[in-house]
């Protein structure tokens, strides 16, 4: 047995010497003694290619490239393997999770964490870590006996030891872990004749675990020769750049001493890898104590980008330059990263530049539709059919793939489910899921067309098919008793779903279409699923288990599944992490994300055992564990060194100033260190570089057109743009090869969000030959014509959800107050506290079950909200009693509807208006409350409108003047037109147009001592003071509040008197009768003007800006109109807000509808 060590810094030819040596042996004797090259898993393919691609090698059976586990299998083939079944990673984790659940009550520190999935994963990692470093449960138990140990540490180790011991007992004589198989491999080494004849080479490692050192020791002892290659200068200083590989060398020296053999060291000092002085100097001086600055020759670049996306776009452009101008191949280029956020950017950006690439990382299968379907199916059963997992299950399209437009059908089903609050076993209620119920979805009174009916029938059928499958699955699983039964039931359910046939069909189609990677994913998904089921049967077999526990354990197994994708082509860019990727001798290496916090990366302890506990363990038990955080932090410079020395020709470092979440980022201190090694190595700011060199952006045809669009848009906004972009536009426009899609991009340049004015015929088709509308519809048009067009022309509806909306709350208050008002005939004065509570309870019991399919009884939160609503109603009734006590006006009519043709005698007649086109305008609506007061054969009427929102409980006469607030004037006009139907006298005059704010009042106090309990209720009631406009007629003023006298301001209506008895300007909101009539008549003209504009086909995106606010803030149609402040601000409509509306209305002549003058 001989031991060789090839030692040297990066690029000094160590691996080349090894490969040359192996190849010479292969050429000299192709059938000679075995040669084994041991390398990390990530390097084996690359090293195999080095032999396969050598034209001088005509094939050989001598050499094998293996990692430690594959080497153990090779020995087992010769001497015989272990009799136990080997546990996969998933099987190990499932077993440990089940043990944790069984032993939970015995845990001391981790009892509360045991129920979480992540805990068993951490515990599995810790046990595997112990096994790698040859720590047994006995080691832990011996260590726990230390009386000086902290209680928390003692409890922690006792918990881990308990699970570890139980795990070892479960697998004893029946199963074996990957770590244990390596120990068995060590035991088998003396029996292997093949190993005794072998020359062993170990390359690509920078550190080893205890079990791996034991393997190396066995190889040295039993193999013919062992050669280990290490990237180190041999310096054992713990603060040296090469601390980590030097630590390996120290361990190898200890092994050699134990075996009483010497190490034949060969030092490599001459640099061979690097093609230029820049990279040689970078490698030699990176760890130098005294800096020797030299001129940079341009083979090292540092790029600064504003964002990570801009950074990767620039890398993609530079790769294209490498291929086109430097004649590199994609396989000559590598990208190394550390921040996981970059992986998504590679997938989203590199395909845009048609750059082939392979990311050397394993991807979890959990997000694949098939896996999402299975996990959602499990959650449906676990959660008793809750809506979220059900919808996730449906949206995977795995169980609904046989339906045409299945995604659209599922969307409709989702709308219905969210509107009706379907959950639990309500999914099984066929009465809920019928076509008639679907017809009412979001559109009251709508009659289904034949096509709509057929679509909804398909939705119902799809839902029934999926439910039948879930019920079959649930039934099969509920009949199982053992794990084997459950696994069998699960597999049979998948066959019942026809999942195997469906997946194989999809795989074949993908293969035929050349999408081999996606096809491979499907194969791995199915094989992985079967493997988990096999593991469950292997580990648990006929062990009894509850369905709930089985589904938990099964889900744990699914979490472990990962895609292992083989590169689809040899000529592609290699992408990997700086820590794990094995890329050597690339012509150009890009190191992206070189930011502080990423390189170096703060290393924090993520295992259950803390750094302090590791150190204590090593000191007391003399057992080495995995490196602590401070040791790993010292090795960050080595990680950077290894990454940047992978290139032969060029190295490009890049970083961004903003992270993926918008946070500020700083440059890596390593880049500052690198920059200090060279003169004239400047950081290239990418935006500034492109501004000076616009041609550098023109590397890829499609992406150039997108950048061209941005440049031309800037040019149109009078920004300075390089002439190169105008020249580029002409070249692209005149080229048949390049101009595809250019017209579409150019049309976006002149896009100004202009809508099309509807023609007369189309307007009538959309809106009808007469307009039947509520007041709010006209107010909506005044807010924005497009809003009206979207809601009443296109009839777009928001998805209705099973939750209480603001308008639902308003409807509840209206209905409750109507119910109570009718019960007491509007005589609020008669109410006492007992009566208020009785009537409130009656009203709520009658009305709340009708709200949103009994929504307010669906959960504890909504039942609490119901009580809050009751409290608000009780306070409101107290306020109404207070107001009624001091007013001569009596509430007479409640929730009074009006329309052109009344349906009952209680409804009022609304006079028809006519647009300028001759289209009838029929206004309909409902007046909350009409109060009347009669004196001297003259009836005065108050319009009372209940509002649950404070913002809408104010009458703004400027808005009234401009037609933005039309409700109150319309209601008063309707009442004045219907004196006979309302039972009023021949002479009827307006009293007040008033808003009543239904709310829960709040009063602020500076301290508890300021609260006067006797006055508190009175103060709360005064918060309900009516707001609006009152007729200045003295009869009306006196009747509104009988307490009015000089120097008194009413707390129930907006009226106050001065010392001389005149109306106070500050405390009164009044207008004379003639002015109110003018407002009413002007309001009619606003109706006519608005309706005429509607029928003229106006659909402009033109919101009306009032008091610096836009209606867009609360508009549901922004995603449709795409309103943009930069593009559409010129279309914002405004009004003169400085006018005095009363003076303005008095100064204009208003014609009544018969052409006379009022």
Swiss-Prot record:
NCBIfam families, A to Z: addB_Gpos
Residues annotated for [4Fe-4S] cluster binding in this entry: 784, 1112, 1115, 1121
Protein's name in the database: ATP-dependent helicase/deoxyribonuclease subunit B
Domain UvrD-like helicase ATP-binding: 1-275
Domain of life: Bacteria
Taxonomic source organism: Staphylococcus aureus (strain Newman)
Gene Ontology molecular-function annotations: 4 iron, 4 sulfur cluster binding; 5'-3' exonuclease activity; ATP binding; double-stranded DNA binding; helicase activity; metal ion binding
Extra remark: Despite having conserved helicase domains, this subunit does not have helicase activity.
């Amino acid at each position: 047995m001989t031991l060789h060590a090839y030692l040297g810094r990066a690029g000094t030819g160590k691996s080349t010497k090894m490969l040359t040596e192996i190849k010479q042996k292969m050429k000299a004797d192709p059938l000679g003694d075995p040669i084994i090259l041991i390398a990390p898993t990530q390097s084996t393919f690359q090293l195999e290619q080095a032999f396969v691609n050598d034209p001088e090698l005509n094939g050989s059976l001598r050499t094998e490239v293996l990692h430690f586990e594959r080497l153990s299998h090779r020995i087992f083939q010769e001497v015989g393997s272990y009799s136990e079944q080997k546990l996969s990673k998933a099987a190990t984790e499932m077993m440990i999770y089940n043990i944790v659940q069984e032993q939970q009550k015995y845990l001391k520190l981790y009892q509360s964490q045991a129920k979480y999935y992540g805990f068993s994963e951490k515990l599995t990692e810790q046990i595997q870590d112990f096994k790698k470093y040859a720590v047994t449960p006995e080691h832990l138990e011996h260590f726990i006996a230390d009386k000086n140990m902290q209680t928390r540490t003692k409890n922690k180790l006792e918990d881990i030891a308990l699970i570890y011991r139980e795990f070892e007992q479960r697998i004893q004589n029946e199963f074996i872990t990957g770590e244990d198989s390596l120990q068995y491999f060590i035991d088998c080494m003396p029996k292997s004749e093949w190993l005794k004849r072998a020359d062993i080479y170990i390359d690509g490692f920078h550190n080893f675990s205890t079990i791996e050192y034991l393997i190396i020791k066995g190889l040295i002892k039993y193999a013919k020769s062992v050669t280990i290659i290490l990237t180190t200068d041999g310096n054992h200083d713990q603060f040296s750049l090469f601390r980590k590989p030097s630590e390996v060398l120290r361990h190898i020296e200890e092994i050699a001493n134990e075996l009483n053999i010497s190490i034949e060291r060969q030092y490599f000092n001459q640099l061979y890898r690097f093609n230029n002085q820049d990279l040689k100097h970078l490698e030699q001086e990176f760890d130098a104590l005294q800096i020797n600055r030299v001129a940079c020759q341009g083979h090292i670049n540092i790029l600064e980008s504003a964002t990570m996306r801009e950074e990767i776009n620039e890398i993609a452009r530079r790769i294209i330059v490498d291929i086109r101008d430097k004649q590199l191949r994609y396989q000559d280029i590598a990208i190394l990263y550390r921040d996981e956020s970059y992986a998504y950017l590679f997938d989203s950006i590199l395909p845009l530049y048609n750059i082939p690439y392979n990311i050397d990382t394993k991807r979890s299968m959990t997000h694949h539709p098939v896996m999402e379907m299975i996990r959602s199916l499990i959650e449906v059963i676990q959660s008793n059919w809750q809506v979220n997992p059900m919808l996730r299950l449906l949206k995977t399209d795995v169980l609904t793939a046989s339906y045409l437009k299945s995604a659209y059908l599922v969307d409709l089903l989702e709308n219905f489910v969210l509107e009706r609050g379907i959950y639990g076993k309500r999914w099984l209620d066929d009465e809920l899921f019928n076509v008639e119920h679907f017809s009412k979805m979001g559109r009251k009174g709508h009659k289904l067309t034949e096509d709509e009916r057929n679509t909804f029938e398909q939705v119902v059928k799809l839902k029934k098919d999926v439910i039948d499958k879930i019920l079959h699955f649930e039934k099969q699983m509920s009949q199982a008793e053992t794990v084997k039964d459950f696994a069998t039931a699960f597999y049979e359910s998948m066959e019942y779903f026809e999942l195997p046939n469906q997946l194989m069909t999809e795989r074949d189609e993908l293969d035929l279409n050349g999408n081999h990677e996606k096809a491979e994913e499907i194969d791995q998904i199915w094989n992985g699923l079967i493997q988990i089921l096999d593991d469950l049967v292997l580990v648990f077999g006929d062990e009894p288990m509850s369905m709930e526990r089985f589904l938990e354990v099964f889900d744990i197994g699914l979490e472990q599944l990962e895609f292992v994708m083989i590169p689809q082509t040899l000529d592609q860019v290699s992408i990997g992490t700086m820590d794990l990727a094995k890329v050597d001798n690339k012509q150009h290496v890009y190191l992206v994300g070189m930011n502080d916090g990423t390189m170096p990366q703060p290393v924090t302890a993520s295992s259950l055992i803390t750094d302090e506990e590791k150190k204590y363990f090593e000191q007391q038990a003399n057992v080495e564990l995995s490196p602590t955080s401070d040791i790993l932090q010292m090795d960050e410079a080595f990680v950077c060194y290894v990454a940047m020395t992978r290139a032969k020709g060029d190295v490009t470092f890049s970083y961004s100033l903003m992270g993926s979440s918008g946070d500020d980022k700083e440059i890596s201190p390593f880049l500052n260190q690198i920059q200090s090694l060279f003169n004239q190595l400047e950081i290239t700011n990418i935006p500034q570089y492109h501004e000076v060199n616009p041609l550098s952006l023109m590397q890829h045809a499609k992406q150039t057109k997108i950048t061209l669009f941005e440049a031309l848009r800037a040019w149109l906004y009078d920004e300075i743009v390089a002439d190169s972009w105008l020249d580029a536009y002409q070249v692209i426009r005149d080229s048949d090869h390049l101009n595809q899609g250019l017209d579409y991009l150019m049309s976006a340049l002149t896009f100004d969000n202009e809508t099309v004015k509807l023609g007369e015929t189309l307007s009538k088709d959309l809106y009808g030959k007469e307009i039947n509308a509520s007041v709010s519809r006209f107010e909506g048009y005044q807010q924005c014509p497009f809003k009206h067009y979207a809601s009443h022309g296109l009839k777009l509806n928001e998805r209705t959800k099973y939750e209480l909306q603001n308008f639902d709350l308003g409807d509840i208050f209206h209905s409750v107050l109507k119910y109570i008002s009718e019960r007491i005939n509007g005589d609020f004065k008669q109410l006492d506290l007992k009566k208020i509570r009785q009537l409130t309870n009656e009203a709520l019991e009658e009305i709340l079950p009708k709200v949103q399919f009994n929504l307010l009884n669906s959960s504890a939160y909504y039942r609490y909200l119901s009580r809050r609503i009751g409290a608000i109603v009780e306070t409101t009734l107290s306020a109404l009693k207070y107001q009624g006590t001091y007013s001569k006006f009596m509430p007479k009519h409640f929730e009074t509807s009006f329309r052109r043709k009344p349906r009952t005698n209680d409804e009022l007649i609304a006079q028809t208006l006519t647009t300028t086109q001759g289209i009838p305008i029929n206004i309909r609506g409902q007046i909350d409350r009409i109060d009347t007061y009669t004196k001297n054969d003259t009836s005065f009427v108050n319009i009372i409108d209940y509002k649950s929102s404070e913002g809408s409980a104010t009458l703004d006469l400027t808005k009234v003047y401009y037609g933005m607030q039309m409700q109150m004037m319309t209601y008063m006009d309707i009442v004045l037109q219907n004196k006979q139907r309302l039972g009023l006298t021949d002479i009827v005059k307006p009293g007040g147009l008033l808003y009543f704010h239904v709310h829960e009042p709040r009063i602020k106090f500076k301290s508890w001592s300021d609260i006067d309990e006797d006055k508190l209720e009175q103060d709360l009631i005064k918060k309900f003071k009516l707001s609006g406009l009152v007729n200045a007629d003295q009869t009306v003023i006196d009747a509104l509040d009988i307490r009015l006298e000089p120097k008194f301001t009413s707390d129930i209506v907006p009226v106050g008197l001065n010392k001389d008895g005149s109306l106070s300007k500050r405390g009164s909101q009044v207008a004379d009768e003639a002015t109110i009539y003018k407002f009413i008549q002007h309001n009619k003209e606003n109706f006519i003007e608005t309706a005429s504009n509607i029928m003229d086909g106006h659909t402009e995106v033109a919101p009306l800006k009032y008091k610096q606010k836009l209606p867009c803030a609360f508009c549901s149609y922004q995603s449709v109109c795409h309103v943009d402040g930069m593009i559409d601000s010129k279309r914002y409509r405004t009004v003169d807000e400085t006018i005095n509306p009363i003076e303005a209305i008095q100064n204009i002549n208003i014609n009544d509808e018969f052409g006379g003058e009022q």
